[in-house]
Amino acid sequence: MAAVRPRRTALRPGPRAAVTAGAAALLAATSVWTFGSVSGAEAATTLTVAKDGSGQYTTVQAAVDAIPAGNTARVVVSIAPGTYRGLVKIPAGKQNVTLQGSGAGRSDTVLVYDNASGTRKPDGSGTYGTSGSATVAAEADGFQARNLTISNDFDEAAHQDMSALQAVALRTAADKVFLDSVIVTGDQDTLLLDTASKAAPGRVHMKNSSVVGNVDFIFGRATAVIDTSVITLKKRWDGSSAGYVTAPSTAAGRKGFLITGSTVTGDVSASSFHLGRPWHAGGDATLDPMATFRNSTLGAAVKSAPWTDMSGFSWKDDRFAEYKNTGPGSGAASSDRPQLTDAQAADQETADWLAGWTPSAS
């Protein structure tokens, strides 16, 4: 039987390569066929990014841009260790994209930028706004991020003349989002877990990860599970300790944030942080924000009355609860500290949030 032996390395868009075949495999006399690769990433399952030019692309956005519109097959963007300063957006038409650091640890590959809500756009069309400030914005279903850091390093101290200091590191506005072994770090509004619209689904599963911030730094209307992760409380720009972990904006009848098997900690003052407050985005009274912290370890920074009001909306009118938390920041059931019953807790498990979706690395 004749053999056809292609070149062992993957073709990049553009180059040509030779394939040698045994004579018995050919009907014509020639023994070398020449092939050209297609442009873009139609046939690719993995695209490589490296700052030094050793990959197919030198920026993450260039790799994302190479994925064809309408893509539904999984495409892994493998990113070599290094710090990549720039914005990354995965638009709605490019489903099932994975951003994956190829280093030994999640701190080795860093995607970072420094826009804030009040940062003016270069074209003079206004400011970015909170959602537009994101370093990485994922708007396509099936988005995954793994083994990397996503950061917004906006310098609040240097911009106290700016009125809108919210600075998002990662924004997701999609369904079936899987964040595995990532660090998402910033100050105010670090992690925006959202949906494409008020009526759209937006399931998120975050595990083995770390989220760092100080004010409303896990927020949005997604149905999100944060599991086996570390939530790190960070001091404000002036060195003070005060903040809020979550600000859910859940639609009525939907599930909001479930933090389970995780740790809330940080080098901040005792009794200085709330676990959450209700964000009725745009003053929408029809929303029913929801956050549950369960089976987690709460550090001493957590206030004894861990929930508080926001913009005239009382947390007691929405859905905030705990279940079997431990640590110096935990506390017994009281009017300030609603605890789920065992029966209620049985309906607030990860599987209830994911509703038939089983995230898997791919």
In which residue ranges do the predicted regions lie?
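Acidic/proline-rich low-complexity IDRs
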Residues: A10, A25-L26, T46, W353
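N-terminal export and membrane-targeting signals
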Residues: A2-A24
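Gram-negative bacterial Sec-dependent N-terminal signal peptides
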Residues: T20-T34
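Sequence-level preference for short, compositionally simple segments enriched
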Residues: A44-S362
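C-terminal region of N-terminal signal peptides and the immediate post-cleavage residues
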Residues: T30-T45
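Residues at secondary-structure transition points
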Residues: P13-G14, L27-A28, V88
